[in-house]
Amino acid sequence: MTGNDELGHSDFNRHSGFGLRVCRSFLVLLSSLFSLFLLAGCPGEDITPPDVAIIAPADGDSIAGPTTIRARATDNRAVARAEFFVDSTEIGVVTSSAGDTFEYNWTPAGMLPGTTHALRCYAIDGAGNRGSSPPITVHISRAVGTHHSGTIGAPETWTVAASPHIVDSDLDVEALLTIEPGVTVGVADGATIAVGTHSPGGISAPGRTDSTITLTAINPAPGPGAWNGIEFRANAATNGSILRHCVVEYAGGGGALVRCDAGRVDIDSCVFRASSGRGVSASGTGLRSLSHTAFSGCAGYPVSVALGLVSALGAGNTLTGNKRNAIELVGSTVTASDTWPNLGFPYAITATLTVADSSNPLLTVAPGCSLLFADSAALRVGVGQPGGLTADGTSGTIAFAALGPGNWRGIEFWEKTDPLHTALNFCRVGGAGAAGSAAITCYSVAVTIINTRIAGNAGSGVYTFSTGFARFENDTVTGCVGSPLHIAAQYVGTIGNGNSFAGNSEPAIQVIGGTITQNVRYQRQDVPYHVTGTVDVGSQYEPALTIESGVVLQFDPGTALTIGLAAPGQLLAVGVPDSITFTGATAEPGTWHGIELHRYASSSTQLKRCRLLYGGGADQGILFINGSVPTLDSNEIAFSSNYCVYLQNTILDPDTLRQSNWLHDWAPGFDDIFEGP
């Protein structure tokens, strides 16, 4: 065969295929050789960290001033940089070396004499491997720093270059002392920094977020109260004093870390901690503003201010880990109108607080506030002079409660309380009742109490003297040792709807006897009315006592309900749909006298679907009618100690009374109805 093989391929195809196979084999061989060359010619990945050690100063050395820290660092390749640390803080980075030695010049600014610190160096190579030296310990010499004591009588600046500044003993600041950002001030045990003792003085300490000013104890092992604190005294300059981004710690031996009695000090973005007393204490004109400051570890109240300085308390303060995380209010009388804002922490009131002055001050408590009262302390409004209290918790319940495990004396509204500007709305009042007091007491003034819960009191819930309420609605009174409410008969009608009085030791509203001279309507409540004295309805105004359907009145022994005895009066008791009950405080015949309808009782008087029970204590029946002609229908009159009905000087027909009413269980030896002349 010529030109083509038996399969039809040409000679050209046959030879060219062989050539291609040879070329492919050569390329594979070449690639393998190149790979071997690369593997043999490239070094391995660098994963070895440098070796590094500090060679100066020596472990245990004392440092008295600027010091050169030397570290020797080696690596299998090269060290790129060295990082120097004091304790956990980086103080510098060095990228050049003399051979294998890296040096950093360190000034121990802010390091207090007598303290001990750890030095460490990290060496980093080009691959990012990081090697650490063993730490060495150095001691700061007691000769380090700038020392101060005595009196500063001219303006002075404490620079960061001369830091730390050491206060060796009491220091009187009688001019403006400026402290630069980053300065550390160490104070000797028992020493005080007093500002404005004799002449105007001030402290301007405007630290920064990244350059805090620290005022601390020089003692290397300090505790709360090691030094006394900073005191702005009576002659402190009235402007210019500021503590911003400052740390004040381990003081309080003088009562507080910072005490402001004058000077209108501004405190902002500080840290106050480890006090043996309070954190900040302010009185008089001592404080202009306090905001964004953290208080912790205070053995006393972290913030304590006079009543007139509450407005100086701004936003952003935090109270954590103190003996009591609350703001102490110091003083006895609110003499100017003020608003207490909700700062996120309770107000602690350690003595009785009075709101009263000739200027008629109004104390407004913001929604969400909590006012905590010490044992036997009270909140009194309008004592001797006008005053008002507004506590509207519509957008956040306001709490009035006990500060500790004991009881406080509660809220007292006195006769000169301003009723137009006094109201409790959506409040909680609890833990009161010290010395038998009520949670709320009203003396001859009608205030508004609505949507409020009064609970857990050692005394009564609400006690009124010669007064009722402007409004008393949707309130809950529960958990009281005593009755939920004491009120005179004349003012029962001021008790509104929607109230709950259940769950008290005495399960009834206590009604004090007396004369009803104006129209009154007794509304149905969820507990009975317990009447403790005779109630007489009558006056020149011809008052009507209206009893709502379903009302229950329980009368103490020897008491009665009299209508029209000496002056015109009227009783309207229509028990539709639910009957009205007049009964004794105990289920014994003769417990109370009964209802007496005298000659001045209006002919419009009605008793319909009422129950008159366990009366007759005056031997005149449960229902005594003398000279009047009331309407009596569908009543139950029973369990008398004598007669059920006693008629005298009236045209009422006994048989008609028997037919239209149910008389039963009168005493043996008596008739159901006695008919006199």
Feature roles, as predicted:
Residues 16, 27-36:
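Low-complexity proline/serine/threonine-rich segments in eukaryotic and viral proteins
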Residues 44-142:
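Long, low-complexity serine/threonine/glycine- and acidic-rich segments characteristic of extracellular
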Residues 2-13, 18-20, 71, 84, ...:
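Secretory-pathway ectodomains
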Residues 39-41:
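C-terminal motif of bacterial Sec signal peptides marking the signal peptidase cleavage site
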Residues 3, 32, 68-69, 75, ...:
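N-terminal compositionally biased, intrinsically disordered segments and leader/signal-like regions
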Residues 43, 142-677:
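Beta-strand/loop edge motif enriched in small/polar residues
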